[in-house]
């Protein structure tokens, strides 16, 4: 039995993303609509996800495009306010993801009581955001310095819109990441949000680290969820839950329910 059962309540867990709209300081933030509108839309999406039956939810600043690798304090503060106002209505385990800043994610997790975070913790990359370097040693020390040792860590080892600097095979990356960092899970992704995770790649990673939770991190949908969950220990998904399966849209509860009905059938 993996920690998914203990923390989320089931194996083959479905972690649904609650994508927060652009926040103060983001280029797309609408100051006329303001934070109350962002909170209202987050509540709508949260309700649709929970009522549709997902196992857990993860809040992320998905519309803070283009992303920073070290976020400004107003981003974390805005996310803390949103989650704080939603707290009384959160009925399932939740995590947070401050894109793309693992230190800020730990800070937000401690402020809100989140059970897990997902981030790019390791590696150096050429990315759409410039040369992207990480400092996992300092990040994990920060985790323990602030008392966040119980927060589960989901290591994304195939970062979106980026390529590893250096010719390293994904299996080598998976193996050394597990050895050096003891992650609670590895996330395997496609190129961008909503892009399908390659099943062959997912299989190679899971076979390399069979004792570590491996999650399909992008592009899981009604058509491929059975195949993906036959390999992975669970999935993180968002786009397929949105109206017409379009990233920019809001969550459609009917799509969530249909997806989860299939997942329950797979779990039997």
Curated annotation (Swiss-Prot):
SUPFAM superfamilies linked to this entry: Ribulose-phoshate binding barrel
PANTHER family in the cross-refs: SGC REGION PROTEIN SGCQ-RELATED, ZGC:162297
Family: Belongs to the BtpA family.
Protein's recorded name: Putative sgc region protein SgcQ
Entry superkingdom: Bacteria
Disulfide bonds: none
């Amino acid at each position: 039995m993996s920690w998914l059962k203990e923390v989320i309540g089931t194996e083959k867990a479905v972690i649904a993303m609650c994508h927060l709209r652009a926040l103060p300081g983001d280029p797309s933030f609408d100051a006329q609509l303001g934070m109350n509108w962002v909170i209202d839309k987050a509540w709508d999406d949260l309700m649709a996800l929970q009522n549709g039956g997902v196992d857990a939810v993860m809040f992320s600043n998905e519309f803070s495009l283009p992303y920073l690798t070290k976020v400004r304090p107003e981003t974390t503060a805005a996310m803390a306010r949103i989650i704080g106002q939603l707290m009384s209505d959160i009925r399932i385990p939740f995590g947070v993801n401050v894109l793309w800043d693992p230190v800020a994610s730990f800070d937000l997790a401690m402020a809100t009581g989140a059970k897990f975070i997902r981030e790019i913790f390791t590696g150096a990359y050429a990315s759409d955001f410039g040369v992207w370097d990480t400092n996992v040693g300092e990040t994990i020390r920060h985790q323990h310095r602030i008392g966040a040792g119980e927060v589960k860590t989901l290591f994304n080892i195939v970062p979106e819109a980026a390529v590893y600097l250096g010719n390293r095979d994904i299996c080598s990356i998976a193996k050394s990441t597990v050895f050096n960092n003891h992650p609670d899970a590895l996330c395997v992704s496609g190129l961008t949000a909503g892009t399908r995770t390659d099943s062959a790649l997912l299989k190679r990673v899971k076979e390399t680290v069979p004792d570590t939770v491996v999650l399909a991190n992008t592009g899981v949908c009604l058509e491929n969820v059975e195949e993906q969950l036959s390999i992975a220990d669970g999935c993180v998904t968002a786009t397929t839950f949105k109206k017409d399966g379009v990233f920019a849209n809001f969550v459609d509860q009917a799509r969530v329910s249909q997806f989860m009905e299939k997942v329950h059938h797979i779990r039997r």
